[in-house]
């Protein structure tokens, strides 16, 4: 995913010709940060999500997903703003999330670039719109359809319709893991 994303990002930068401030937005869990140690622990101890999740996040021990750190450093070097949009709890998890990202050398891990789920957030769309206020959002990264767009209703049919609608963007503007 990240290797092809680098090629796509270069295309977007070239196409932009310096006209707009460019940004990319990434989900955190299983896209930037690897939580397989938590998943393994939960499996061995017969726990189901979200049991133990908050404690895992607070431990700030997740390592980057393979290729994420290198790609993000590349995007940073190219002058692209990086935003992390996650459904982690804004009140409980912001400090630990920022600490984890910084410890792993993930660029632009400042609070203004880590957009976690607040009490009133129903979806990630409102946080994507925050980025789009003063940026051209050229790429989205995630491991779930909801990291890219929000279905009007949570049915298999509405998800299939969204996939059909956006299928030409997958692998280009929308990188799915």
Where are these regions (language model features)?
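Soluble non-cytosolic domains of exported or imported proteins
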Residues: 3, 19, 58-66, 88-95, ...
């Amino acid at each position: 995913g990240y290797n092809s994303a680098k090629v796509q990002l270069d295309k977007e930068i070239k196409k932009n010709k310096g006209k707009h401030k460019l940004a990319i937005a990434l989900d955190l869990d299983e896209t930037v940060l690897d939580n397989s140690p938590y998943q393994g622990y939960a499996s061995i101890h017969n726990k189901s999500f979200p049991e133990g999740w908050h404690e895992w996040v607070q431990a700030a021990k997740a390592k980057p997903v393979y290729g994420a750190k290198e790609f993000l450093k590349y995007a940073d070097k190219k002058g692209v703003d990086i935003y992390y949009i996650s459904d982690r709890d804004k009140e409980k998890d912001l400090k630990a999330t920022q600490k984890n990202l910084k410890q792993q050398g993930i660029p632009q891990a400042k609070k203004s670039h880590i957009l976690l789920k607040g009490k009133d957030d129903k979806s990630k769309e409102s946080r994507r719109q925050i980025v789009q206020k003063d940026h051209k959002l050229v790429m989205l990264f995630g491991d779930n359809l909801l990291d890219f767009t929000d279905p009007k209703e949570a049915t298999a049919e509405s998800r299939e319709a969204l996939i059909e609608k956006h299928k030409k963007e997958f692998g280009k503007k929308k990188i799915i893991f």
